[in-house]
Amino acid sequence: MANIHQENEEMEQPVQNGEEDRPLGGGEGHQPERNHRRGQARRLAPNFRWVIPNRQVNDGMGGEGDDMEIFMEEMREIRRKLRELQLRNCLRILMGELSNHHDHHDEFCLMP
C-alpha cells in the first residue's frame, strides 16, 4: 500500500526539465510523437538562426537585392574560371597530341 502511495506522489511531481504535461491520448488534430527526440527538435526549430552565418541572417533584413546581385556575380566568376580551366586543359591535351603524337585515351576534355 505504501508503494502505491509513493508511486502516485512520483507521478504527480512537476516535470523538472521544462516540459509541460501532455495528455497521452492526444486530442483534436494531435499526432502522437513517435520519438521523444524528434519532438524536442521540433520545439527547437524556431531557434535555428544562431546556426546561420551573419551574412545570411542579415540578408533577411532588407538587403536581399544587393546580396542576390553579389551572389549572381560570384556564380558568373566561378563559371568563367571553370571554363578557363577546362579550355586550358583541352588545349594542353590537343597541343600535346599534335607535338608528341602520343595516345591520350585516358585524358578527356570538357568543352562548354
From Swiss-Prot:
Residues 101-105 are annotated as: His cluster. One of its GO terms (molecular function) is molecular function inhibitor activity. Residues 69-112 are annotated as: Interaction with 14-3-3 epsilon. One of its GO terms (cellular component) is cytoplasm. Its main location: nucleus. It is found in: Nucleus; Cytoplasm, Cytosol. Residues 69-94 are annotated as: Interaction with p75NTR/NGFR. It comes from the Eukaryota. Ubiquitinated. Degraded by the proteasome. A motif (Nuclear export signal) lies at residues 78-88. The keyword Cell inner membrane does not apply. Pfam families: BEX. The keyword Nucleus applies. InterPro entries: BEX (IPR007623), TF_A-like/BEX (IPR021156). Residues 1-45 are annotated as: Disordered. Zn(2+) binds at residue 109. Keywords: Apoptosis, Cytoplasm, Metal-binding, Nucleus, Ubl conjugation, Zinc. GO terms for biological process: apoptotic process; negative regulation of protein ubiquitination; signal transduction. May be a signaling adapter molecule involved in NGFR/p75NTR-mediated apoptosis induced by NGF. Plays a role in zinc-triggered neuronal death. In absence of reductive stress, acts as a pseudosubstrate for the CRL2(FEM1B) complex: associates with FEM1B via zinc, thereby preventing association between FEM1B and its substrates. The nuclear export signal is required for export from the nucleus and the interactions with itself and NGFR/p75NTR. The histidine cluster (His cluster) and Cys-109 mediate zinc-binding. Belongs to the BEX family. Self-associates. Binds to the DEATH domain of p75NTR/NGFR. Interacts with 14-3-3 epsilon (YWHAE). Interacts with DIABLO/SMAC. This is Protein BEX3.
